[in-house]
């Protein structure tokens, strides 16, 4: 078989092979080949090698896949086994958890039961503690009572102990003798009769003592009689028991023992009754002590009242204190004011008023003063009479001596002294303003009022305090306030006096002049009319009777009246 192969021109040009230029190809005719030749020719190419290589690569891949699959299967088997183990462990853990939960619930239930039991036990414990305390307290009280009863029994059964010891000795002797022989019934009856006689004698003695104590304390007699009756009944019972025991001649020792027991019971009953009587006597003694304390308290209260009454009736401080105070203030006031003291006639009138303390004294004094002051000029008759009456009342009140001055009136007297000092200061200002120079002017009523005020201030200083009563306190306080207001009015009066116009006469001036000494004002008026105004200050100094001249008085030589301009400026 011929096969034609097609070759490219570029590939075979160098070999000198004919080419078909039109087509660019060359046709090569191959001879037929055998199988061997084909094999040789086939070996020249790489087709077989490529196939082999491809086959080998596929084989290698298959082998690798097989190997990897085997490994994966082994790994999977291992993992499956591990997972199965884990699953088994998980199942076991789940079962364990279920068991633990069940146990936990059981434990919780047990815990709740235990807590409830604990609370119950604690409550029982606390209640038992309280009960134990109460029982201990009761036991202590009972022990105390038993000890007290034992002490009382020991104190009261001292004479009975000897008798009991004798009876015990006899009982022991009889108990030892009963083994050898039996005692005679007659002897036993004689012994029991002697014991009964002794007990009767003791009861009679006790009853006699109770009767004597009942006479002393009749309140306890009834209690003692009741106790005596109870003791007699106990004694009768003892006698009956003794007779019954005597009838039993076989058991002599037992009879003696029963006698002792009965005697002890009797002593115990007697002690209880005696303790009751003692308690009653203690209550009575307490009542007596309380009554005595009340009586003492009443006595002390009465003594305090009596002492207060005595203090109220004690004499008050003497008049020397007041007499020593008022002259000192009087002297200081004279140093400041340098005005004349009251005249001798005024002192005489004061002495007369001291002697006359009754209603007749006041009436006569009013008549005398009205007779002395009839020469006043410039005032109407009705106003003169009112002023004279008030002046007389004022002099009478200031001229009287101090009677018994109580301690609660000292404050009022101190208030008076303060008022007098204020009046002194007002009077000093009044003198500086030159009132004495204008006393001889046409205004007689105003001069009288000014002189009257000056004299009133001296009179208030020189007068002695009057007896003050408690119901006059409020009136005096009112007077003090009014006097302070009047002092301010007195300071303002000089300006009214210096005015050129003649002011009309008012009732206020009369009321202000009603509280002063009118007799002294009359004397000052007469002296001022007789002598000029320049020598008034020297005359005021000379009128002091029985007083030496002082240096303070010599310094003041003249006084100049301030001008109207200075007055208008408000300096005065």
UniProtKB/Swiss-Prot annotation:
UniProt record, GO biological process: maintenance of meiotic sister chromatid cohesion; meiotic sister chromatid segregation
Pfam families, sorted: Shugoshin_C
Cross-referenced InterPro entries: SGO_plant, Shugoshin_C
Keywords from the named record: Chromosome partition, Coiled coil
Basic and acidic residues bias spans: 244-257, 336-352, 523-542, 552-572
Region Disordered, residue ranges: 185-221, 244-285, 333-352, 484-572
Any single Gene Ontology cellular-component annotation: chromosome, centromeric region
Record's keyword annotation contains DNA-binding: no
Stretches of the chain forming a coiled coil according to its record: 59-110
Something else known: Knock-down mutants show meiotic defects, reduction in seed set and fertility, and premature separation of sister chromatids before meiosis II, but no defects in vegetative development or growth. The localization of SYN1 and ZYP1 are not affected. Sgo1 and sgo2 double mutants are almost completely sterile and show a premature separation of sister chromatids at anaphase I. Shugoshin is Japanese for guardian spirit.
Protein family: Belongs to the shugoshin family.
Protein name: SHUGOSHIN 1
Source taxonomy: Eukaryota, Viridiplantae, Streptophyta, Embryophyta, Tracheophyta
């Amino acid at each position: 078989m011929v096969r034609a192969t097609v070759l490219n021109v570029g590939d075979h040009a160098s070999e000198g092979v004919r080419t078909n230029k039109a087509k660019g190809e060359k046709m090569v005719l191959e001879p037929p080949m055998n199988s061997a030749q084909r094999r040789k020719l086939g070996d020249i190419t790489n087709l077989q090698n490529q196939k082999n290589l491809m086959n080998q690569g596929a084989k290698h891949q298959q082998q690798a896949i097989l190997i990897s699959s085997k490994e994966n299967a082994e790994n999977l088997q291992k993992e499956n086994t591990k997972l199965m183990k884990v699953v088994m462990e998980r199942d076991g853990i789940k079962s364990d958890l279920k068991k633990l939960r069940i146990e936990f619930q059981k434990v919780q239930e047990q815990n709740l039961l235990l807590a409830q039991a604990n609370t119950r036990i604690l409550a029982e414990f606390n209640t038992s503690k309280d009960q134990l305390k109460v029982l201990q307290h009761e036991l202590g009280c009972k022990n105390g009572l038993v000890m007290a009863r034992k002490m009382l029994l020991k104190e009261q059964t001292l004479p009975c102990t000897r008798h009991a010891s004798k009876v015990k000795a006899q009982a022991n002797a009889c108990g030892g003798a009963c083994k050898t022989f039996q005692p005679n019934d007659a002897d036993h009856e004689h012994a029991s009769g002697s014991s009964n006689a002794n007990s009767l004698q003791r009861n009679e003695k006790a009853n006699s003592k109770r009767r004597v104590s009942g006479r002393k304390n009749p309140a306890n007699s009834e209690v003692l009689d009741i106790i005596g009756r109870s003791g007699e009944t106990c004694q009768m019972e003892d006698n009956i028991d003794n007779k019954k025991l005597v009838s039993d001649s076989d058991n002599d020792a037992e009879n003696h023992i029963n006698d002792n027991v009965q005697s002890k019971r009797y002593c115990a009953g007697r002690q209880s009754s005696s303790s009751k009587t003692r308690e009653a006597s203690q209550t009575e003694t307490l009542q007596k002590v309380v009554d005595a304390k009340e009586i003492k308290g009443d006595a002390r209260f009465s003594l305090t009242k009596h002492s207060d009454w005595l203090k109220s009736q004690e004499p008050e401080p003497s008049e020397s204190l007041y007499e020593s105070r008022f002259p000192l203030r009087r002297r200081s006031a004279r140093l400041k004011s340098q005005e004349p003291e009251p005249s001798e006639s005024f002192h005489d009138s004061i002495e007369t008023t001291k002697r006359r303390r009754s209603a007749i004294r006041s009436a006569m004094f009013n008549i005398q003063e009205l007779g002395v002051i009839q020469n006043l000029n410039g005032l109407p008759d009705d106003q003169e009479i009112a002023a004279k009456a008030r002046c007389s009342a004022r002099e009478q009140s200031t001229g009287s001596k101090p009677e018994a001055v109580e301690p609660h009136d000292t404050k009022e007297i101190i208030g008076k002294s303060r008022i007098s000092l204020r009046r002194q200061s007002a009077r000093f200002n009044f003198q500086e303003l030159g009132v004495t120079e204008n006393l001889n002017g046409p205004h007689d009523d105003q001069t009288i009022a000014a002189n009257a005020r000056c004299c009133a201030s001296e009179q208030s200083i020189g007068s002695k305090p009057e007896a003050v009563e408690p119901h006059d306190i409020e009136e005096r306080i009112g007077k003090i306030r009014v006097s302070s207001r009047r002092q301010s009015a007195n300071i303002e009066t000089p300006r009214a006096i210096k005015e050129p116009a003649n002011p009309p006469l008012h009732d206020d001036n009369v009321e202000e002049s009603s509280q002063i000494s009118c007799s002294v004002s009359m004397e000052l008026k007469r002296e001022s009319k007789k002598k000029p105004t320049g020598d008034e200050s020297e005359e005021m100094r000379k009128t002091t009777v029985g007083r030496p001249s002082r240096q303070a008085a010599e310094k003041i030589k003249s006084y100049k009246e301030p001008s109207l301009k200075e007055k208008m400026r408000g300096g005065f």
